[in-house]
UniProtKB/Swiss-Prot annotation:
It is found in: Endoplasmic reticulum membrane. GO terms for biological process: glycerol metabolic process; triglyceride biosynthetic process. Its main location: endoplasmic reticulum. This is 2-acylglycerol O-acyltransferase 1. It comes from Xenopus tropicalis (Western clawed frog). GO terms for molecular function: 2-acylglycerol O-acyltransferase activity. It comes from the Eukaryota. Belongs to the diacylglycerol acyltransferase family. One of its GO terms (cellular component) is endoplasmic reticulum membrane.
């Protein structure tokens, strides 16, 4: 493989952007393991007092990721996130106002490999969410196992991440006077295995849990499509039925999360590495679908609302696709 090295005279701003994204990729892939290593080092060093205090803290704080988390605006305002946003860049696009007197479920599509658009828009304060949607607070739900990792869980909660459990979503949406948004990556880990450049496959036909929660809480549904999310990385070919895909799906069932074999560019060269490509991400927030609170919705009501959501998502995509580089003949594929 011939390596294409980055030029030496790159502007400082671009170097800072690369550094910001590198620390984010590192945090996503290795920070949790490092935190576990720190915890084990405390055990080996027999620092029992520190361990006892932290274990007590874990016991008292264990349910916090399912109770709205513990965001810290200072962390969400770190300058590193501005450079992170500018690397791609990431842009949040509003199609209509959202009434802060309601609670909402935003369905985020597609998952992509590392969900960069969801993190940049809803876990930092640099893409204008507060200005576009005043009076609303976003909560991005991620897999619960991240919050079982010592030390890492505190960092994750600081940026507004919460657990992707039914209890957690219900807690966010139970705010009496409205103003909360649960952002759920509907396709989940399974969808990340289809996150190839140009792919428009969404795993959504069997995903109806968010519909049931919307009925229970009376939360309005908002489809969100992030154009460019699947263009950030290449993946090793893994078509359905291939040996690699079978192994990945098996590991996902065992561990609860997927392991896409991805690559893109490096820090000092453009040919290979785990850094994402500099590709623009446009996250478009659609119009809300009103939902009447219903404690025990019938199967017909669930199916009807699910179909309404699919139709709204498809309409959102069709309305904006050509503006963001999708050919006219391309359409979403629901599986």
């Amino acid at each position: 493989m011939k390596l294409e090295f980055a030029p030496i005279n790159i502007p400082l701003a671009r170097r800072l952007q690369t550094t910001a994204v590198f620390q984010w990729v590192f945090s996503f892939l290795l920070l949790a393991q490092c935190c576990i290593g720190i915890f084990l080092s405390l055990v080996l060093a027999r620092l029992w007092l520190i361990l006892a205090l932290y274990v007590l803290w874990l016991y008292l704080d264990w349910e916090t990721p399912q109770a709205g988390g513990r965001r810290w605006e200072w962390v969400r305002n770190w300058t590193v996130w501005k450079y992170f946003k500018d690397y791609f860049p990431i842009r949040l696009v509003k199609t209509c106002d959202l009434d802060p007197q309601h609670n909402y479920i935003m369905g985020f599509h597609p998952h992509g490999v590392l969900v960069a658009g969801a993190f940049g828009n809803f876990c930092t304060n640099y893409t204008g969410f507060k200005e576009l949607f005043p009076g609303l607070t976003p909560y991005l739900h991620i897999l619960p196992f991240w919050f079982r990792c010592p030390f890492f869980r505190e960092y994750a909660m600081c940026v507004g991440l919460v657990s992707a459990t039914k209890k957690s979503v219900n807690h966010v949406l139970s705010k009496e006077n409205g103003g909360n948004i649960s952002i759920i990556v509907i396709g989940g880990a399974e969808e990340s295995l289809d996150a190839h450049p140009g792919s428009l496959i969404l795993h959504i036909l069997k995903r109806k849990g968010f519909i049931k929660v919307a009925f229970k809480q009376g939360a309005h549904l908002v489809p969100v499509f992030s154009f460019g999310e699947n263009e950030l990385f290449q993946q090793v070919p893994n078509p359905k039925g291939s040996f690699l895909r079978c192994v990945q799906e098996r590991l996902q069932k065992i561990m609860g999360f997927a392991m896409p074999l991805f690559h893109a560019r490096g820090i000092f060269q453009y040919s290979f590495g785990l850094m994402p490509y500099r590709m623009p991400i446009h996250t478009v927030v659609g119009r809300p679908i009103p939902v009447k609170q219903t404690s025990h919705p019938t199967q017909e009501e669930i199916e009807s609302l699910h179909q309404q959501y699919l139709s709204a998502l498809r309409d959102l995509f069709e309305e904006h696709k050509e503006r963001y580089g999708i050919p006219e003949h391309e359409s979403l594929i629901f599986t």
